[in-house]
């Protein structure tokens, strides 16, 4: 029989409950008020009193309201039908909620995440008599562009023998597709879906590998200078309006992955609506179909209850780990982890815990680390390799990278793509600072070349600061040429037009080709009589390179521009 209790105190979305019976941490419970059941989660136990965070608005909850505990942790349902869906943080399908409740979400309405009536064409890959363990494949269904493997549930701890398996055909997620038997002779029915607690990492794999293979984003500044590896982690901190959301959307569109999961936790509703409107209309460059076919969106806007933000981050990473277990490459984009940290700060304050820096909880670093540590590249039991790459945007107030959430994130990620107000105001997009950003991963271009090019950016910035004080006349022609070359590298290679059909996504082959051209310009010595002549020449080169960026790779126009560029360089270079 489930444990019962009653409300003895309410403080915002924190409810204190007096319980009669046993309760466990993170257990889900329902507060019964005004004819509705409001979902909540146990976050602290003190004797016979329990503190729970409610995932809904707590308006109307009063002392004496009855509470029922479920004896279950907060879980997600895993199975075919997750892709193309838009969920809230508790995995309620928002399109279904809209049909049922209208434009405004009602409290206490919880729907099943997966469609129980839809039939999936199941093709078996195992047979009666096979010995299986948790995470092994029984067969697959086609979900959008993905071979969705039907697996033995991850919570099964022993080895089992398949005693029954259905023939190929159409089945719903609740229909029995196999029966497995353990060593004691007990039989277990297997369906296409099962539940898994969101705060428990999925560990049904043979070993974890060190991320080394680059995950191509087709954004030049990232792939060349600050690469991300498959199974790696990266963060995108930046002030408001610097282009974090656009950069994440471009990455999700062009990244070399099989499935994209977007966790919009605490973002403005307008940005989430933009994502929901754009994604179904965008074409996946790899398949020619809608981008939504390989995307799952979990959104908790800033207007939704605070507690559900935390749940949305864990829901997203659990779904990512589930698809990783199929041997797929997953990209999870969390936008923005600052809002999630603010939700933790709010709960910590209500629990009257000793605050850390800027009133964030003292355990902020360990919570952020435990989230990013769930990224990784793994070898599955059958030898396949799957990965989850995690990218979190951070919204520090005023673009201050010294604040606690950014600092806690920097300690655990493998790449840092810092967006700056200075670059976004100058309309240099993506506004990733080439001087402040870094990456620990290997990119698509030789590291010696990129370090040489980056040294030009550093020198160019120093000369630019000097020119602000003494003017152009106060520096030598050689220094002025270094400054012009650094500006050429910035405008022709680091900057990219996300709204141009050709320049929005640049293949690794084209990146190598264009970088070699720019690298040769940086290495070449030129001689000019004065600064005006130098500026005119570099501007001519810049225009030529920009035109090449907007031309199809190696077509007639591209080749013509490249030939003209070569003649210009040969005309002015010092032999």
UniProtKB/Swiss-Prot annotation:
ATP binds at residues 238-245. SUPFAM superfamilies: N-terminal domain of alpha and beta subunits of F1 ATP synthase, P-loop containing nucleoside triphosphate hydrolases. It comes from the Bacteria. Its EC number is 7.1.2.2. GO terms for cellular component: proton-transporting ATP synthase complex. It holds the Pfam family ATP-synt_ab_N. One of its GO terms (molecular function) is proton-transporting ATP synthase activity, rotational mechanism. The keyword Translocase applies. One of its GO terms (biological process) is proton motive force-driven plasma membrane ATP synthesis. The keyword Nucleotide-binding applies. It catalyses: ATP + H2O + 4 H(+)(in) = ADP + phosphate + 5 H(+)(out). Keywords: ATP synthesis, ATP-binding, Hydrogen ion transport, Ion transport, Nucleotide-binding, Translocase, Transport. PANTHER family: H(+)-TRANSPORTING TWO-SECTOR ATPASE (PTHR43607:SF1), V-TYPE PROTON ATPASE CATALYTIC SUBUNIT A (PTHR43607). Belongs to the ATPase alpha/beta chains family. HAMAP family: ATP_synth_A_arch. Produces ATP from ADP in the presence of a proton gradient across the membrane. The V-type alpha chain is a catalytic subunit. This is V-type ATP synthase alpha chain. The gene is atpA.
């Amino acid at each position: 029989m489930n444990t019962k209790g009653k409300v003895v105190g309410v403080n915002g979305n924190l409810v204190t409950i007096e319980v009669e019976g046993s309760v466990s941490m993170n257990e889900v419970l329902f507060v019964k008020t005004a004819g509705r059941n409001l979902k909540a989660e146990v976050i602290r136990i003190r004797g016979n009193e329990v503190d729970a965070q409610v995932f809904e608005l707590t308006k109307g909850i009063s002392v004496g309201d009855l509470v029922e505990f479920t004896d279950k942790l907060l879980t997600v349902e895993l199975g075919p039908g997750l892709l193309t869906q838009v969920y809230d943080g508790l995995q309620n399908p928002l399109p279904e909620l809209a049909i049922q409740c209208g434009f405004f979400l009602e409290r206490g309405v919880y729907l099943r995440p997966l469609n129980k009536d839809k039939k999936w064409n199941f093709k078996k890959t195992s047979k009666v008599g096979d010995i299986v363990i948790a995470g092994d494949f029984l067969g697959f269904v086609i979900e959008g562009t993905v071979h969705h493997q039907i697996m033995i549930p991850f919570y099964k701890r022993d080895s089992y023998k398949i005693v029954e398996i259905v023939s190929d055909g159409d089945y719903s997620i609740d229909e029995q597709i196999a029966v497995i038997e353990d060593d004691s002779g007990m039989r277990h029915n297997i369906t296409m879906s099962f539940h898994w607690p969101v705060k428990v990492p999925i560990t049904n794999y043979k070993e974890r590998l060190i991320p080394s293979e680059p995950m191509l984003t087709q954004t030049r500044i990232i792939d060349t200078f600050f690469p991300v590896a498959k199974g790696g982690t990266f963060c995108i901190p930046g002030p408001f309006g610097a282009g974090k959301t656009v950069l994440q959307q471009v990455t999700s569109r062009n990244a070399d992955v099989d499935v994209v999961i977007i966790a919009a936790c605490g973002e403005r509703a307008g940005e989430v609506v933009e994502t929901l409107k754009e994604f179904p209309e965008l074409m996946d460059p790899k398949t020619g179909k809608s981008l939504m076919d390989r995307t799952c969106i979990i959104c908790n806007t800033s207007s939704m209850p605070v507690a559900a933000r935390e749940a949305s981050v864990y829901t997203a990473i659990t779904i990512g780990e589930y698809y990783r277990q199929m041997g797929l490459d997953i990209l999870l984009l969390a936008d923005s982890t600052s809002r999630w940290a603010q939700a933790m700060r709010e709960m910590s304050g209500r629990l009257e815990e000793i605050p850390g820096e800027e009133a964030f909880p003292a355990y902020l670093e360990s919570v952020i680390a435990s989230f990013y540590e769930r990224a990784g590249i793994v070898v599955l039991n059958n030898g396949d390799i799957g990965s989850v790459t995690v990218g979190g945007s951070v919204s520090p107030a005023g673009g201050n990278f010294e604040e606690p959430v950014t600092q806690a994130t920097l300690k655990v990620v493998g790449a840092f793509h810092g967006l700056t107000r200075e670059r976004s105001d100058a309309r240099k997009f993506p506004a990733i600072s080439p001087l402040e950003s870094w990456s620990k991963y290997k990119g698509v271009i030789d590291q010696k070349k990129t370090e040489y090019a980056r040294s030009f950016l550093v020198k160019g910035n120093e000369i630019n600061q000097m020119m602000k004080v003494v003017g152009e006349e106060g520096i030598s022609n050689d220094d002025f040429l270094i400054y012009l070359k650094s500006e050429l590298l910035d405008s022709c290679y680091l900057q990219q037009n996300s709204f141009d059909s050709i320049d929005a996504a640049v293949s690794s082959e084209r990146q190598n080709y264009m970088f070699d051209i720019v690298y040769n310009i940086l290495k070449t010595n030129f001689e000019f009589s004065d600064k005006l002549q130098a500026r005119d020449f570099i501007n001519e080169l810049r225009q030529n390179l920009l035109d090449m960026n907007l031309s199809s790779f190696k077509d007639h126009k591209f080749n013509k521009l490249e030939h003209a560029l070569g003649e210009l360089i040969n005309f002015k270079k010092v032999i």
